Structures are given as C-alpha cells and as structure tokens.
A protein has these predicted regions:
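Short, polar/acidic, helix-capping and beta-turn segments at strand->helix junctions
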Residues: 2-4, 8, 13-137
Length: 137
C-alpha cells in the first residue's frame, strides 16, 4: 500500500460517479460514457456518431474529428477542463487534417495528447478521441 506518498488518497475514499448524457451517443458496448473519480472525469473514446441517430458523421478525418470533439462537451464542461486526450487514427497520413480541426477546439494551452494509429475503429470511423478532464473547483 502506498502510505508514505504525500497527497495519497485511498481509492475507497474517492466517490465514483457515472456520467451519462443524451447529448452524446450511447456507449457501443458495456462501458460508461464517462466516469468521475475525485476531481477527474475519464471519458470513454468518442467516435463521430450523432447522438440522436447513432449514425456516423462525416466521411473524412476533419469532419469526424469535429464530431468526436463535440461529443466530449456533453458532460457540461468546457474544453479548457480537458487535460489529456488520446487520439486514435486509422490512417496516420491524415494527422495534419485532424490537427487542423483539433487546434480550433484548443486554441490556448492545449491538453497533453497522444496519437496512435490503429487498424480499425467501431462503425468504420476514421478517428476516435478519449479524454481526461478536471472538474472546475
């Protein structure tokens, strides 16, 4: 057990909160849209689906990046609350297309980010974005 670390809080002392929003597409499997633990919110990967219909939005990486990022806002936070993202792309040669849209959502102090090329994504999406946000105090 990690008892000698300054600021350590035992896991059982943190309340786990399940976030679910009709403004974001429902989960495609047995997972939550987002989970809050302490001041952090962990968003499941967002593929570019329209919330009302569950249909894939856009045919290119730019359109799909925009929709995936719009889906992240459904928890009632601003993009300034996002501290880390992971972007999954099916074609890393489209990295610049994703970056051009991504930069419009985070014009100042963008979050830390990793980008990973994958062989496929649900529903034939070209991009998926997961995020970690911090609740405003």
């Amino acid at each position: 057990m990690l008892t000698g670390i300054s600021g350590y809080v035992p896991l059982n002392a943190l309340m786990k909160t399940v976030f679910s929003s009709p403004d974001a597409p429902p989960a495609l499997g047995p997972y939550s849209q987002a989970i809050g633990a302490g001041p952090l919110i962990f968003f499941s990967g967002q593929v570019p689906l329209e919330a009302a219909t569950g249909e894939l939005v856009g045919q290119d990486v730019a359109e799909q990046t925009k929709q995936a990022l719009l889906n992240l806002k459904s928890a009632g936070l601003s993009y300034a609350n996002i501290i880390k993202t992971t972007v999954f792309l099916t074609d890393l040669s489209r990295f610049a297309d994703m970056n051009a849209v991504y930069a419009t959502f985070f014009p100042e102090a963008p979050p830390a980010r990793s980008t990973i090329e994958v062989s496929g994504l649900p529903r034939g999406a070209k991009v998926e974005i997961e995020a970690i946000a911090i609740k405003p105090s």
